[in-house]
Amino acid sequence: MPTDPDSRLRGNDEAILLAEGQKSAVTEYYLNNGEWPKDNTSAGVASASDIKGKYVKSVTVAKGVVTAQMKPDGVNNEIQDKRLSLWAKRENGSVKWFCGQPVTRNANDDAVTADGNNKIDTKHLPSTCRDTSSAGK
């Protein structure tokens, strides 16, 4: 099992890269439909279990929030089975993305709420992925 810091960062980097790969589809869906896609299918991306990697178990789209779930084993203890999210908010006619702890969104709200379950401790997140659920308010 990887225990060195580089392995931990690779896991986080992979999670962010796989999640970021869904951003354009989520953004396009929102711009075309005026609402956030409710799931992977409506966003036009692969199923959550098909978006995976060496360290990432799945990537889920839920109401426009993209959440990467780390694998329960084969990754550093600090991130085993933990999650991080990317989410967008409307801003001046466009869409601005944020990255950080896992969040959820109700229906077509712009606001997101922190989802404290299985979150990666902030100190283990890359500096570019430390937005809070209140970002952009």
Regions found by a protein language model. Give the residues of each.
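Periplasmic/extracellular, small/polar-rich flexible segments of pilin-like filament-forming proteins
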Residues: L31-K137
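Conserved hydrophobic/amphipathic alpha-helical signal-anchor segments
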Residues: D6, R10-S47
